[in-house]
Amino acid sequence: MRQRGAEDVFRFTGNETHTDYFRLVLRDGNYLLVGGRNLVHNLSLTDLTEQQRLTWYSTDSDVKMCLVKGTPEENCQNYIRILVKTDSNTLLVCATNAFKPMCRDYGVHPGNYTILKEKGGQAMCPYDPRHNSTFVYVDGELYTGTVADFAGMDPIIYREPLQTEQYDSKSLNAPNFVSSMAQGDFVYFFFRETAVEYINCGKNQRRN
């Protein structure tokens, strides 16, 4: 067996002119879909070379409105936060869209993507790219844990049309979402939050 060396290590750095904030990796057959800033990269599993890319920039009007509200320009970009193959030819993508969350269904074709449908992404995708969120797609349904307002004060677990009680700290007390998964008939959400018994001590408690 040949010993592997540095030449056998493949790297993908994305756009080197700014931070991409990669958060998502979705395997699609022999490819990896990687979500970042304004882009979804389609990479070969063999050597991580880019085979194709999906570009989605926020409109000038959405960016302008984001800046008017005092948000730094770095955050008024379109950060991809949800990637799901809903069937063999359709990709669901949700992104922060300059603090105006949006979701799109894309048709997947050799060499390109086409927009099939667009809708608001509130309660599915965070406004702020710095907020942690999670999602899982089960039996044709998207389950999400995120925040549903501009200020990040309304945490939510959501599956259309159901959601957790708004502003109910007994259910969600400023959670920091970590992950989610389906097991049998249940969907589990994992997050950290300030434990009530340690409210004055700054202690965090893991919940699920």
Where are these regions (language model features)?
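Disulfide-stabilized extracellular ectodomains of secreted/luminal proteins, especially beta-rich
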Residues: 1-208
